[in-house]
Amino acid sequence: AWEKSLPQITKLTKSPLILGRGIQTNNLRNNIFNDLKNQKLNVNSANLQFDCCYEDISRVKNIISNNNNDSVIAAGGGKVLDSGKYIAESLNIPCITVPLSASTCAGWTALSNIYTKDGQFIKDVALRSCPKILVYDHKFIQTAPSRTLASGIADALAKWYESSITSSKIDDGLVQQAIQISRVLRDQLLIDGGKAFKGQFENNPSWQNTVEACGLTAGLVGGIGGEKCRTAAAHAIHNAITQIITPNKFLHGEIVGVGLLLQLRLEEMKNNNKLADQSIKQLFVLMKELNLPTTIGQLGINVFENNNLEKIADFTCRDKSEIHFLPFEINKRDIIEVISNFEQQKIKT
C-alpha cells in the first residue's frame, strides 16, 4: 500500500513534514523519509515529545511554518495521527495519515483528542474534514507489538456498545446504518480477535480481518453516523482515569476496555439491561485471552486510596461528559457504587 500511495502523495505535496514519536517506529519513519526523498520531495521531520497536547502542537506548527512545509504526514499511533490532523487543519494544509499499528481508527476520523503533556484528557475536537490520504499498509502494522492490536480490539468493540445505546432511537438512516456496521464489527472481533492476537501474520485471514476492522471499519461508524453516533460511558470513564493514571503506561484501548465493562455494569444496575451481565462475561473471556486489563486496579490504580474513586466519579460526571449521552441519568454516586462493587468482585465466567 505504501509504494502504491507514492504517486498520489507526490501529486498532493512537494514539501511534507513527517510527524512521529518514539524510538520504536524510528526505522519505519526513516524508510518513509527516504522513499519520499527518492520522489524528489523536500522532506522534513519532527517528533512529538508528549501526547497530542497544545505544547507539542504549537512547537510543530512553528517548525512547519519555518520550513514552509505544505503538508503533514503523520506516521504512528493514535495520538500522532490526532496531532497531525489537528496541526494540518489549523494551518490549512493537507494531512496524510500512515498508521503504524492497528490500535486505533484515528487514521481517517475527523476528530482529534487533546491531552495535557502528562497524558490527561482535556477534550475532543471535531475537525472540518478527514485526512486527504490514508495509507494502511499491512507491512507497517505487522511491526507493531501485539499489545497494540489487543488495545485496538478493545477500542473498536466499544463502538457497538456505546453507539447502540446512545443512538439507536435516532430517526436517521445513516446513523442506523453506522450502528449496524458497529454490530458487525463487534461480531467480527469476537470471532477473529483471539485468533489474530495469537496467530501468525501470513496466511491468517483472522489477522487481516481484525487489523482492518480496528483500523478501517471502526472509523466508518463515526464517519457515516457523524456526531450523532456518540461515545458513552466507556470513553467517559477512560477520560476520567487518565486524570490519575501513571502517564504513558497504558494504551488508550486498554483503558477504554475497562470503561466498557463498567458501562455494561451501569446498564445492568440503572437501566435493567438483562443482557449486560452476559455481555460482560463474553467480553471478559476475550479480554483475558488478549492480556487486557479488566479492572481499574489492573491499571495500577487503587480506587480506595487518595480519593481516587471520587476523582474518577467527578470527572466522569462533569458537564458535557459523554456519560450524559446515556438514555438514563447517571450521577457521581452511581459511578462510585458501580466501580466499588466491580473492583471488589471476581467476575465469574
Regions of interest found by a model, annotated:
Residues 1-71, 296:
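ATP/NTP phosphate-donor binding region
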Residues 89-181:
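A glycine/threonine-rich phosphate-anchoring loop and its flanking beta-alpha core
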Residues 171-289:
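Active-site segments that bind and position negatively charged phosphate/pyrophosphate groups
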Residues 273-349:
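C-terminal charged capping/lid subdomain of soluble metabolic enzymes
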Residues 2-5, 25-29, 79-85, 104-108, ...:
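Short glycine/serine/threonine-rich phosphate/pyrophosphate-binding segments
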Residues 1, 20-22, 77, 98-101, ...:
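Fold-independent oxyanion-binding glycine-rich loops
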